[in-house]
């Protein structure tokens, strides 16, 4: 499939052939598994000391004393110990470090999931169904010249995004930033932020600095491209801007 390459003014300058990876069948099941595997591998195993609450010298005084037959502190028989309902006792069902919390996925399945997520960025219906505003976007996938990689000023990237028709989607991401409900707002996750366009480049020559302050915009090189960036929240079809060099590098890696 041939697509147009746009300059930074939003004008088509040439046509190129897309790599075969954009013809990969749509596999939402594998994409979901790959994203969840990526999520779970960021979780740190936690557990409790196996001897917590058990470091007491206790005795069982037996029956006939008018007291519950639970373990008692040897030097203070009035106070229970060891049992979960006692002060300083063990926990009932503490978390264990042995618990398997990581979801794994085979290497070939993960590679196929990335390829399928890449192909989903070229599906207009999937991009629109994900919530992106693409009314003014000239084409999906949007391919631009390599000069985009050298833009390092936020004001310049803003004008480029407007000329390429993706600024409406960035405004949508800005308006959908909300304060998180619950205690997560106290733990470094105060805001729930919507995802806007993804910029994939062959080489970072300043574009990361120029685009990082725009709400919802992510910049990544082809080598670091992952399924979580292509399908945030397990939902494929993210609006993606590719540079011409990124398309060529994609052809070398995935064919």
UniProtKB/Swiss-Prot annotation:
The record's Pfam families line, in alphabetical order, gives: Ribosomal_L4
Which biological processes are named by the entry's GO terms?
translation
A molecular function GO annotation: rRNA binding
Q: Which UniProt keywords apply?
A: Ribonucleoprotein, Ribosomal protein, RNA-binding, rRNA-binding
Please give an example of a GO cellular component term from this record: ribosome
Role description: One of the primary rRNA binding proteins, this protein initially binds near the 5'-end of the 23S rRNA. It is important during the early stages of 50S assembly. It makes multiple contacts with different domains of the 23S rRNA in the assembled 50S subunit and ribosome.
Family matches, as HAMAP family: Ribosomal_uL4_A
Q: Which family does it belong to?
A: Belongs to the universal ribosomal protein uL4 family.
What is this protein's record name?
Large ribosomal subunit protein uL4
> Where does this protein come from, organism-wise?
Thermococcus onnurineus (strain NA1)
Q: Give the taxonomic lineage as stored in the record.
A: Archaea, Methanobacteriati, Methanobacteriota, Thermococci, Thermococcales
